Amino acid sequence: MAASELIDTFGRRISYLRLSVTDRCDLRCTYCMPERMQFLPRAEVLTLEELRDLAVGFMRRGITKIRLTGGEPLVRRDVVDLIRALGRHVGDGLEELTLTTNGTQLAGHAQAIADAGVKRINISLDTLDRATFQRLSRRDALASVLGGIAAAKAAGLKIKINTVAMKGVNGHEIPALIEWAHGEGHDVTLIETMPLGEVDEDRTDQFLPLVAVRESLEARWTLTDSDHRTGGPSRYVEVAETGGRLGFITPLTNNFCAGCNRVRVTATGQLYPCLGGGERVDLRAALRSDDPDSNLSTALDTAMKIKPERHDFRIGEGEEPALARHMSMTGG
């Protein structure tokens, strides 16, 4: 074991960084943020150079996969410059550089992203129905998202569709969305609603356990458990009838903490060792200190000591959100 590796107190090796480049987004998805979301002052957000230096510091400590997130990462001005800078490390310590996007800005960036060394991306899409999309995101942007997906496919990017399953919202159209995605050659991952941040709607009413979703899909299709792993929380099945792969992320009904290999850093440089925990370490202060390399490494050691064994997500009538911060702040 290399001395520089990031190992937490439960023996888990941290190899995956989810790095938020902005808390801003051009959608207002009801399960993610309120309509009148108060975004961070720009002065508090790390510069692109600081984000690059931060990522390089993590690579020195054994991080081999970096995912750029938001908010919506592609609304950050000149973010493709950051992608290019990090892409130069792919194959030289960094095994994979990827990002998660809502797809609205993707048509104009897909080729540049692919040229920078990104091989696959995740795209958030909860519905193929224009009215439902507008209700969920509070924006009429489905056509832009579908155009972005088409552009990414044309650029040669491998695409995974992330879909939050919501009772009474999109649960009934999940089979059609899977059929469409698999027909286009895209994997799909279904995600349970997570109790993060104050929003304008009741998550209890929307919560749809994926155990129930899987049972309904098994009545329609032949699902075979897959050995496919991406180092993340998703558990995959192969769908015989569609010829595609389907993942399930179940933080509420079946937590995925034992094999956790990741940390998250916000656009302000706050490291959260756990998506569902309040523990954090300030990396921005280390970056802006007189000895950034040494202080950043020390801060990462501190983060390993406070990473909890598991999250404490709960959802139910009268339950407060597990944490007040929004997913757009943490980096989804």
From Swiss-Prot:
Molecular function GO labels: 4 iron, 4 sulfur cluster binding; cyclic pyranopterin monophosphate synthase activity; GTP 3',8'-cyclase activity; GTP binding; metal ion binding; S-adenosyl-L-methionine binding
Keywords: 4Fe-4S, GTP-binding, Iron, Iron-sulfur, Lyase, Metal-binding, Molybdenum cofactor biosynthesis, Nucleotide-binding, S-adenosyl-L-methionine
Free-text comment on the cofactor: Binds 2 [4Fe-4S] clusters. Binds 1 [4Fe-4S] cluster coordinated with 3 cysteines and an exchangeable S-adenosyl-L-methionine and 1 [4Fe-4S] cluster coordinated with 3 cysteines and the GTP-derived substrate.
Cofactor: [4Fe-4S] cluster
Binding site for [4Fe-4S] cluster 1: C25, C29, C32
EC number(s) per entry: 4.1.99.22
Keyword Nucleotide-binding assigned: yes
GO biological process: Mo-molybdopterin cofactor biosynthetic process
Enzyme class: lyase
Pathway listed: Cofactor biosynthesis; molybdopterin biosynthesis
Residues annotated to bind S-adenosyl-L-methionine: Y31, G71, S124, M194
Binding site for GTP: R18, R67, T100, K160, R262, V263, R264
Catalytic activity: GTP + AH2 + S-adenosyl-L-methionine = (8S)-3',8-cyclo-7,8-dihydroguanosine 5'-triphosphate + 5'-deoxyadenosine + L-methionine + A + H(+)
Classification via InterPro entries: Aldolase_TIM, Elp3/MiaA/NifB-like_rSAM, MoaA, MoaA_NifB_PqqE_Fe-S-bd_CS, MoaA_twitch, MoCo_biosynth_MoaA/MoaC, rSAM
Functional note: Catalyzes the cyclization of GTP to (8S)-3',8-cyclo-7,8-dihydroguanosine 5'-triphosphate.
Subunit structure: Monomer and homodimer.
Protein name listed in UniProt: GTP 3',8-cyclase
Organism: Erythrobacter litoralis (strain HTCC2594)
Gene: moaA
